[in-house]
Amino acid sequence: MDIIQVITQELKVEKWQVEAAVKLIDEGNTIPFISRYRKEATGSLNDEQLRALFERLTYLRNLEDKKNQVLKSIEDQGKLTEELKKQILDAQTLVVVEDLYRPYRPKRRTRATIAKEKGLEPLADIILLQMTDKPVEEEARAYVSEEKGVKNVAEALNGAKDIIAERISDEADYRIYIRNLTTKNGSISSTAKNAETQSVYEMYYEFEEPIRKLAGHRILALNRGEKEKFITVKVNAPEEDILRYLNKRVIKKDNPNTTPILKVVVEDSYKRLIGPAIEREIRSDLTDKAEDGAIHVFGKNLEQLLMQPPIAGKVVLGWDPAFRTGCKLAVVDATGKVLDTTVVYPTAPTTEKKIRAAKDTVEGMIEKYGVSLISVGNGTACRESEQVIVDMLKEIPDKKVQYVITNEAGASVYSASKLATEEFPNFDVGQRSAASIARRVQDPLAELVKIDPKSIGVGQYQHDMNQKKLDEALSGVVEDSVNKVGVDLNTASASLLEYISGISKAIAKNIVAYREENGQFTDRKELLKVAKLGPKAFEQCAGFMRISGGKNPLDATSVHPESYEAASALLSKLGYKPNDVVAGNLLGLSLQVKDYKKMAAELGIGEITLRDIVKELEKPARDPRDDMPKPILRSDVLEMKDLKEGMVLKGTVRNVIDFGAFVDIGVHQDGLVHISEMTERFIKHPLEAVSVGDIVDVRVIGVDMKKKRISLSMKGLNK
């Protein structure tokens, strides 16, 4: 198999691009580095294309390894024919390789192997040959043997039937045909174990859908319902068509002595051996594809959450709401340093006196520290906390304080972690959580990288998936996001640094330790003095780490040190000095380069690299998050009972799933925009219309107070 050619066709790119990317990956370069600094080599393949390429490369290389193992095993048995070798080498999937290997795989003791041990294989051959002119019972008498444990004719025939059934089951062509036919024409159904039991799986108590039409989220829901023992799930195959096909392939002659017994064997082989195995394989394949789809959606949601724009330059009060144990508060300054923490008790069980005391405490903190924004976690008691905050803000209108509801998913996981304990050794879990909720609005990326991505909770059935596959995909998303933004080498935490291209957890800690011991970095080259950070790691990481106010102005940009010579020569040619970079004097630089091709040749670099350098010098360390929608800051409160059909509101997309999106409209119950209500045009997936963090206009089309459900529509509102 030509792996490069296969990937080229799948990704719909040029062969040279794939060859270059594979070479760079094999040389130990990271995806963010290749995507950002090797555009010339790959023809500007982006991080998403490179990750898809890497995933397929890994799968296809594993497939080739498996083929080589299988070929060696069959060859060692002396059973490898040219035709079989060609079939194995041409196989496109691991499943087909397994099908072809099945007859030669060392077998555990089965009914067929026991029958072979009893000397019944020749009888099976006679029946399968279909040439005998005697009744099979007569042929079987010759194989009755007390010594071999074959007591009578019936036992001899049963053993021969078992051998034939296994042979039919081992035939790769049959399995491939049956799997394809079942996938094409079969269905999956589910029934309730107890129809009286109420559960979230009630729509699956009597459910059936064709396999080819089954949506990924339904497959994952069926799996979970089955795992939790609410439903029974089965694959319904086109059995009559399958048996007709098998009979036609197995029964070659119309022999009245063998045809009846072979029909029985064919049915037994399918129902006992082939059918259950194919059912398992189909469900496993459907689950894999559903997981891949869900992981893709989870990754997109996570990326949008990580790439939310920071609300910089504000003193923020983080509010972690709770009932009985009180609301934990933490004030952090504009750099994220915690200035003060306390606990207030304005939520149930409470009194007017406690509510007044809470308001006074918060007003005092606002006055003392110059708080201009309150970040409220969206968990338990958020609604009640919000009401107290709104009432209090009305008492101090001159302060111009606003509040924002912040997704607190994962904050409790972080606050109880070893990392949080090291960061805030003198705080309790609640105070750490409040500080995290405050910092999340100041710099969402820097705060969210401290939490296991799975705990951030913007996925679908994430806990039911292959955790290794999920972890790898989400780590890739975090890595790409961190490197897109880049970090300040002198302020970034170890949690942030470990996601930078080429940096491991150990090296991230070493960078922080070096900083603490030697003071701030003044030059990117200083990174080479950090323990375990060698030339290769430096090449991979340097461009993503910036130094403000260092010795070299280019260190404050995303220009890679390998291009400093070219960047300096460019500035000189256009009449600028390096200091003009940090002074912001290079706006409009792109218009001064009249001929990029000629200039690139003069500088000895590629044209794409030159364009990237110019873009970076024009606007150094540009933050891609600036283009994302800003969070909605509020000063008043709306309740679910205030909603009326037809109302148009602004909301924030909190989660995107296969069948729609949940939108926070400020009433503490996210509303659902079904995929059919997103846009007038047809879309296959909600991600074509919205992403997590988007600010959208929605119309209320239904409110169910009893079930606490809000139905929303975006049709005709978002141009």
Regions found by a protein language model. Give the residues of each.
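Generic start-of-chain signal for non-secretory N-termini
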Residues: 1-19, 26
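Long, highly charged, low-complexity intrinsically disordered interaction regions
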Residues: 3, 55, 61-80, 89, ...
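Short, ordered loop/turn segments at secondary-structure junctions
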Residues: 37-39, 128, 238, 321, ...
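Duplex nucleic acid-engaging cores and interfaces of nucleic-acid transaction enzymes
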Residues: 49-51, 59, 63-73, 77-318, ...
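Structured, non-catalytic alpha/beta "coupling" segments that mediate domain-domain communication
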Residues: 73, 87-90, 98-100, 225-238, ...
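A glycine-rich phosphate-binding loop feature that marks nucleotide/adenosyl-phosphate handling sites
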Residues: 180-187, 319-323, 379-381, 405-413, ...
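Single-stranded RNA-binding regions, centering on S1/OB-family and related RNA-binding modules
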Residues: 550-551, 555-719
